[in-house]
C-alpha cells in the first residue's frame, strides 16, 4: 500500500524545487569570487558546472541534488553563464557515482554543511516541535524547518522525513495545547462542559448545539434569545485566562472545529481534546454573543427610528389637505380685510361676511395645531418604541459588562440605573449635549414619566458603542480601540506607510503640492483650458466623458467569442483545477491535509457559486449524495480557504499574456452588488429604500484592471460602502500591489481620503456632485482670485500636528492587520462629539481630497481611467447575476456564515470563469493571427473575459469517474 503524503505535488514543488524565476536566480544562485575560485579547481567543464550546481542546490532550497535529477534549463543557463561553461556540459557529469560524492564531501568541508543526523538532528527536531504551536499549517511548519536548516547549514533530509517530522510536531503541539487548556479547568467546570453534550432540550437538540445556534436579530425576541445563551454561558464561569497562553490562530481553529462537530462526534473524542474544544467554544461564544446582542440593539434602535420617521412623515402628509384648506381660508379672509380697508368698510363686517367669528376661532386653533405638527420631528414619536426596549433592555444592561471612556461616564451610569430597574426620581441628562434636540422633548414630559428618557439613553448607548466611547472587554467588534492600536515605536518601524512620522514633513510636502496645484487650476481657468469644463464666477462645470470605443472593436469581440469552445461548467472547473490546483487550499480543518475527494469538493463549490445549495446539487450530480457533500462542506470549506483559492486563481490569471492587454494589476475598482434575501434572509434582515422594500445584502467586490475579482465581502445593504474600500486592498497580495483605486460616489468620505493617502493608495472617485464640493487650503488669503469662491475653509494645521502620532498609529494598525480599516473608519465616523482624532483625520482627508479634485479637473486621462475601471467592476454584475441561477437569485440562507459562503463561492466561480476565458481568448487571438486576420492591438483592451454564452450552466452536473489530474 502506498504511503499517504501530507504535501501536495504543488506544495512539494514550492518547497523543494530549484527556482527558475530571474529574481530568485539572482538572489540565490549568484556566485561569489570565493565560490568561483573553489569551482575552478575542478579541471573539466562538466565537473565545474556539476560542482557549482550542487553548491547552489545546497544554498537554496537547501537539499542535495538527486541522482539523475533533471535540472531546469533556466538554472543551467544562469550558472553556466557565470562559469563560461555551456549548459550541455552537464550531460557527462558524474558518470562515476564517486565523483558526485567526492564533490559533496568537498562542499561540506569547505562550506560547513552537515547532514541531518546525530545531535544536530535532535536539536532541529526539538526546535521544530517548539515552532509547531505557532505554525498555521503543515506547509508553514515545513517552510520554517527548511529556513532553519539553511540557517544552520544543515542539508535537508528526504521529503518523507520532513513530512513525518512536521506531522509529528503538529500532533504533539495540538495535544500539548489541549492538555494545557484542560489542566486550567477545575473538575466542576469539566463536569459542566460534559453536561453540555448530555443535556437535551426541546426539539431533541443538545445544550451544546443550542448554544452555538445564534444570530444577530432585529427585535426584542431575538435579543432575549441571545441573552438566554449569554446568561447560561456566564454560569459556566470559565475565565479567559484559561486560554491566555494559547496562540490566537489555535483558538480560532479549535472554535471552528467545535462548530463543525455534531454532539455524538464530540462525545467520542479524547477527554482533553473534548474539554479544550468546549472551553474554547464557551469563551469565544460568550464574546461573540455579547457582540451579537449589541448589534441586535443597534438594529432595534434603527428600526425604532425608521418607524418614528415614517409616522412623522405620514402625519405631515395627512395634514396637507387641512393645511391647504386653512391657508386658502386665511387667504380669502386677508383679501376681504384688504378690500374692506380700501373701501372704508368696518373690518368687523368684513370678517363676519368672509368667515364667521366662531369659524375664525376654529381656524386659529387649527393653525396652531398645524404649526405644532409641522414643527415636530421624528424624535416626537420615538417614545412609542419604549415597550419594545423594555422587553430586553434592562436584562441586556445587567448582562453586558460595560466599560467606558470618561466622556461616556454619565451615559453608562444612566444605563446601569435602567438595568437595575429602579425608579429614577429625577433623571440625569448630563449624557446629552446642551444643544441636543432630546432636551426639548424631555422637558415636555410629565414629572415622573421616564419612558422617553430611557429611550434616549438606549439611543445614545447605540451611538457610544459605534464610536468606541463604550466598549466590552474581550470583544472583537466592540472592544477598546486603545488596546488595538500598535505602539508608536512599532508604527515608526512600519515600512508600508506612505507618510513620514514627522507631521511637519508631511505639511511641508502638501503645502508645496497644493500651491502648485492651485496655480495650475487658476491658470487653466483664466485661459479657458480646463478639459471638458470651466470655472466661471466661482462656479465649476464639468462635462461627462463620452464613450471611446473604436469602430471595428465590436466585430472583433464577436469573432473572438465565436472561436471560444463550448464547455460545461463542470469540465471548466476540472480544467482550471488541473492547471492551478486551487482545491489544494481546502485542507481538512482537523488534520490540515488537502481534500482527497476533488470531485466532491468541486460539487460543493459549484453549489455555493450557483446558489443551489447542497440538497439541490446532490440531486443534480452523478457522484455524491447530500451527506457526502455536507461532510466535505463542514470540514473543508472555510472562509480562509476560499480566500486562498481565490488568490491562487487571481494570481495565475494575472500572469497570462492576455491579462497584460487590460492592465498590469496596479489599479482596481470596487462596487457593491445588491442580492435580495426575501423574507428568509433573517441574518441581515435590513431594507435599503434604494432597492425597494425587499431586504437584502451587498457583495462588495474589488476588481483589478485585469478583470480579476480579488476580494469580496458581504456587507449589509444599508451601510455606506466607503469604509470597506481599504478592507479589500489589504486583504491579499493582489490588493497590496494596487496603487490607484477607483470607486463611485458611495465611496466618498474625507476620512477615507485621509486613510488612503496614509497607506499609499491614490483614491480616485467619480463624485456625482463634484461642482458642489469645496476646496480646503492652508491659507485662503493666498488662493488665486479665480478660485476663492470654490474654497470651503482653512485646514487646521495645529489639529493635524497634535494628533499626528495617533493618526500614524491608526494607519500602522490597519497595515498590521490588527483591525479592519472599515471597523476603524466606522468608529471614527460615529463619534457623537467632535473627537480630536476623527477631526484631524478629516482635515488630512480634506487636503488629499482637494489635491484629487484639482487633478481630476485638469486630467482627462484620470477621468478616463476611472471610467474604464468602474465599468469593469460594474460589468461583473451581469456575469454574477447569470451565475445566480438557484432559488430565483435570492440568498435564502438564515445565517450570516451561510450568506458569506454563498457570496464567496459566487466570487470564486466568477474568478475561475474569468481565468478560463482569459486563457481561451488568448488562444482565439493567436488562432485569428495564424489565419492572417488583423488583430489591432488598440482593439484588445475593449475585450472582456466576462462572457458566459459558451458555458453550459444548467442541467445535470456530470463528472468523469476518474478525472485527469
Over which residues does each language-model region extend?
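Short, hydrophobic/amphipathic alpha-helical patches that form generic packing surfaces
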Residues: 51-60, 574, 578, 600-611, ...
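Structured, charged N-terminal subsegments at the starts of enzyme catalytic cores
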Residues: 515-620
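Long amphipathic alpha-helical coiled-coil/heptad-repeat bundle
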Residues: 2-511
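Short, conserved catalytic/metal-binding motifs centered on acidic residues
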Residues: 62, 617, 668-674, 741-746
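Long, compositionally biased intrinsically disordered regions
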Residues: 782, 789, 796-965
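Structured nucleic-acid-interacting core domains from mobile-element enzymes and related host factors
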Residues: 649-686
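Catalytic or ion-translocation cores adjacent to nucleophile or general acid/base/metal-coordination motifs
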Residues: 89, 619-660, 687-805
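Short linear interaction motifs
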Residues: 32-40, 587, 594-600, 650, ...
